[in-house]
Swiss-Prot record:
Molecular function as annotated in GO: ATP binding; ATP-dependent protein folding chaperone; unfolded protein binding
Function, as annotated: Acts as a chaperone.
Family: Belongs to the heat shock protein 70 family.
Organism name: Corynebacterium glutamicum (strain R)
Alphabetical UniProt keywords: ATP-binding, Chaperone, Nucleotide-binding, Phosphoprotein, Stress response
Gene induction: By stress conditions e.g. heat shock.
InterPro entries per the UniProt record, alphabetical: ATPase_NBD, Chaperone_DnaK, Heat_shock_70_CS, HSP70_C_sf, HSP70_peptide-bd_sf, Hsp_70_fam
The protein's name in its UniProt record: Chaperone protein DnaK
PANTHER family: HEAT SHOCK PROTEIN 70KDA
Entry superkingdom: Bacteria
Modified residues (Phosphothreonine): T175
C-alpha cells in the first residue's frame, strides 16, 4: 500500500503534507517552495507546465495559461487548447499530479491516497468535481474535508484535551469561509459554517488592476484591458502590490514598456498605491465577510464572548484590514499568530488522512453540510429534508404522495439552498420514479431518502411503498462527469505523465551533454601544457560531435556522442595523471639529490685518460 497525503487544493496556491512518524510535514516542491501556484500552462512545444514554471511564462503565453480554475470547479466551464477542450477537473488534476509527483520524490515511494480539502461552502457539484479531479490525477480520494475543519483539526490537536470553541476565518485566493467548531478530548465538531464562494484574494487583486487601468487611461487615453499581455502584467503587479501593502504603507507599481501610443512610442506605467487608498477601493469586499460571520454565530447559538480562539486561514488574511476586521467582529480578540495560514489546511488534511488510515488514534472529526437539502413539492415549494449545519454523514427520509389522480410517475427534483421557493435554490439534479400503481391522488406513498456521506456528497433514493419500486441517484451536476469520461481523462493524464517524464529525461540528457562539453573544454584549457596536441584534437573532435548531435532530435545519437567524449576525456585524464606522476617523481629525485649533496666535499674532477680511452664514443 502506498502513502497517503493531505492536499490543500487552493485557488491561488496548493500545498501537500504527509505524516512522518505521526507528525505532519509540509513537503517542498521540486523548485524548493512549500507552496505551489495553482497555475497550468500549455507551452507551444506541447509541454504542460504546472506551478511556478507556468506562472513565470504567463505574460508571453496568456491564452494558454490557466489560473484560478477552482472558481470554475463544478460548472460546465472548459478551455480549448489545440482543438481540445479541458474541463476544470482536468486542469485541477494537473496541479494534483504535480503535488503527487513532488511528494513521491520526497518520500521515495508511491503516493496512492489523499484527503483533499474544499471550501466549507462548496456545493455538492463542486465537491463531486474535486473528487473527480483527484481520480484523474491517479489518487484514491479517501475523503473530501472542509478547509476550516482541517485547519481546526491541525490547530486543535496541538492544544491538548481542554474543550474550546474555535472560530476559523478562512479567506483564500478565490473563496471565503467562516466556521465555528468545538474541540476537546480528541473530538473536532463543527457547530456551524457559512461563506461566499465568489470572494477571495483574486477580487482584491482585480480592484488594484481596475485602479491602475483607470489611472493609465486618464493620463494616456489608452484602455489597457484591450491588451492581453499588458493585462497579465497588471495582474502580476497587483498581486505583488497587495502583498507589499501588508507590511508597507505604500507600494510603487512600475511597469516599463506597458504599451505603445499611436505613434508607436513606448509608454510606461508608474503609480504609487497607498495602503489607505487600497483599503478604500476594497472596503465593500471586506464588508461582504461580515454577513457569513454573523450567520455562523447565530446558527451555532453562541455569543462572541464564548469564542476561545480565532484562527486565520488563507494568505489573504495577512492583509491588515482583514485582521483588524476580525478583531472588531470578535470583540477585540487577537487572532492566533502561531498558525501558518498558507499551510495549516494541508497539515489538517494530512492528519485526517492519518485518522482514516489508522495512523492517528483517538481523533473524531464531525463535519456539517453547509446548505439545506430538499426537493420541490406542489406549488414549487422547497421542502427541506436536511437542514444546513447538520452533522454528516447523515440520512433522512420523508414520505410524499401524488398530486394528481392516477399519476403514473413522480419527478424528484433535488435542490440545495436556503430559499423557500425551490427554483431560487441550486438544482443539484433530478430523476423519475415510474411504475406507480393507478390510485387517487394522496393515496400512493413515495418515500424519499437523502443520504449525505462523509465527503458531503449527496445520494437520493425514491421508493414507492406500494409496489416496492425504487430509483437511486448519486447527485451529479449538469457538469458532472460520467465514469467513462473520468476513466478516459485518467488514461489521458497517465499518457501525458509518460510524455512529460520522457520530455524531462530528454532535457536532462541534453543538459548533461552541454555541461560535459563545457566542463571538458574548461579542463583542457586549465591543463593545456600537460596534454599532447594529438589528444587535444581527439577530445575537441568528440566535443564537436556532441554539439552536432545536440542539433538533432535523436536522443540515442546524443548519448553515443556523450559516451565517446567521456572515453576521450578519460584518456586525457589518464595522460594528465601520468604526467603529474612523472613530474612528481622528478621532483622527488631532485629532492633526494639535494639531500645527498649535504655530505659531498667540493672538488675538481680529473678525467682519467684510461677511462676515456675505454669509452665507446659515438
Amino acid at each position: 500500500m502506498g502513502r497517503a497525503v493531505g492536499i490543500d487544493l487552493g485557488t491561488t496556491n496548493s500545498v501537500v503534507s504527509v505524516l512522518e512518524g505521526g507528525e505532519p510535514v509540509v513537503i517542498a516542491n521540486a523548485e524548493g517552495s512549500r507552496t505551489t501556484p495553482s497555475v497550468v500552462a500549455f507551452a507551444k512545444n506541447g509541454e504542460v507546465l504546472v506551478g511556478q514554471s507556468a506562472k513565470n511564462q504567463a505574460v508571453t503565453n496568456v491564452d494558454r495559461t490557466i489560473r484560478s480554475v477552482k472558481r470554475h470547479i463544478g460548472t460546465d466551464w472548459s478551455v480549448a487548447i489545440d482543438d481540445k477542450n479541458y474541463t476544470s477537473q482536468e486542469i485541477s488534476a494537473r496541479t494534483l499530479m504535480k503535488l503527487k509527483r513532488d511528494a513521491e520524490a520526497y518520500l521515495g515511494e508511491d503516493v496512492t491516497d489523499a484527503v483533499i480539502t474544499v471550501p466549507a461552502y462548496f456545493e455538492d457539484s463542486q465537491r463531486q468535481a474535486t473528487k473527480e479531479a483527484g481520480q484523474i490525477a491517479g489518487l484514491n480520494v479517501l475523503r473530501i474535508v472542509n478547509e476550516p475543519t482541517a485547519a481546526a483539526l491541525a490547530y486543535g490537536l496541538e492544544k491538548g484535551e481542554q474543550e474550546q470553541t474555535i472560530l476559523v476565518f478562512d479567506l483564500g485566493g478565490g473563496t471565503f469561509d467562516v466556521s465555528l467548531l468545538e474541540i476537546g478530548d480528541g473530538v473536532v465538531e463543527v457547530r456551524a459554517t457559512s461563506g461566499d464562494n465568489e470572494l477571495g484574494g483574486d477580487d482584491w487583486d482585480q480592484r488594484i488592476v481596475d485602479w491602475l487601468v483607470e489611472k493609465f487611461q486618464s493620463s494616456n487615453g489608452i484602455d489597457l484591458t484591450k491588451d492581453k499581455m499588458a493585462l497579465q502584467r497588471l495582474r502580476e503587479a497587483a498581486e505583488k502590490a497587495k502583498i507589499e501593502l501588508s507590511s508597507s504603507q505604500s507600494a510603487n507599481i512600475n511597469l516599463p514598456y506597458i504599451t505603445v501610443d499611436a505613434d508607436k512610442n513606448p509608454l510606461f506605467l508608474d503609480e504609487t498605491l497607498s495602503r489607505a487608498e487600497f483599503q478604500r477601493i476594497t472596503q465593500d469586499l471586506l464588508d461582504r465577510t461580515k454577513t457569513p460571520f454573523n450567520q455562523v454565530v447565530k446558527d451555532a447559538g453562541v455569543s462572541v464572548s464564548e469564542i476561545d480562539h480565532v484562527v486565520l486561514v488563507g494568505g489573504s488574511t495577512r492583509m491588515p484590514a482583514v485582521t483588524e476586521l476580525v478583531k472588531e467582529l470578535t470583540g477585540g480578540r487577537e487572532p492566533n499568530k502561531g498558525v501558518n495560514p498558507d499551510e495549516v489546511v494541508a497539515v489538517g488534511a494530512a492528519l485526517q488522512a492519518g485518522v482514516l488510515r489508522g495512523e492517528v488514534k483517538d481523533v473524531l472529526l464531525l463535519d456539517v453540510t453547509p446548505l439545506s437539502l430538499g426537493i420541490e413539492t406542489k406549488g414549487g415549494v422547497m421542502t427541506k429534508l436536511i437542514e444546513r449545519n447538520t452533522t454528516i454523514p447523515t440520512k433522512r427520509s420523508e414520505t410524499f404522495t401524488t398530486a394528481e389522480d392516477n399519476q403514473p410517475s413522480v419527478q424528484i427534483q433535488v435542490f440545495q439552498g436556503e430559499r423557500e421557493i425551490a427554483t431560487a435554490n441550486k438544482l443539484l439534479g433530478s430523476f423519475e420514479l415510474g411504475g406507480i400503481a393507478p390510485a387517487p391522488r394522496g393515496v400512493p406513498q413515495i418515500e424519499v431518502t437523502f443520504d449525505i456521506d462523509a465527503n458531503g456528497i449527496v445520494h437520493v433514493t425514491a421508493k414507492d411503498k406500494g409496489t416496492g419500486k425504487e430509483n437511486t441517484i448519486t447527485i451529479q451536476d449538469g457538469s458532472g462527469l460520467s465514469q467513462d469520461e473520468i476513466d478516459r481523462m485518467i488514461k489521458d493524464a497517465e499518457a501525458h505523465a509518460d510524455e512529460d517524464k520522457k520530455r524531462r529525461e530528454e532535457q536532462e540528457v541534453r543538459n548533461n551533454a552541454e555541461s560535459l562539453v563545457y566542463q571538458t573544454r574548461k579542463f583542457v584549457e586549465e591543463n593545456s601544457e600537460k596534454v599532447s596536441e594529438d589528444l587535444k584534437a581527439k577530445v575537441e573532435e568528440a566535443a564537436k560531435g556532441v554539439e552536432e548531435a545536440l542539433k538533432g532530435e535523436d536522443l540515442e545519437a546524443i548519448k553515443a556522442a556523450v559516451e565517446k567524449l567521456n572515453t576521450e576525456s578519460q584518456e586525457m585524464g589518464k595522460a594528465i595523471y601520468e604526467a603529474d606522476a612523472a613530474a612528481g617523481a622528478t621532483q622527488a629525485d631532485a629532492g633526494a639529490e639535494g639531500a645527498a649533496d649535504d655530505n659531498v666535499v667540493d672538488a675538481e674532477v680529473v678525467e682519467d685518460d684510461a677511462a676515456d680511452n675505454g669509452e665507446d664514443k659515438k
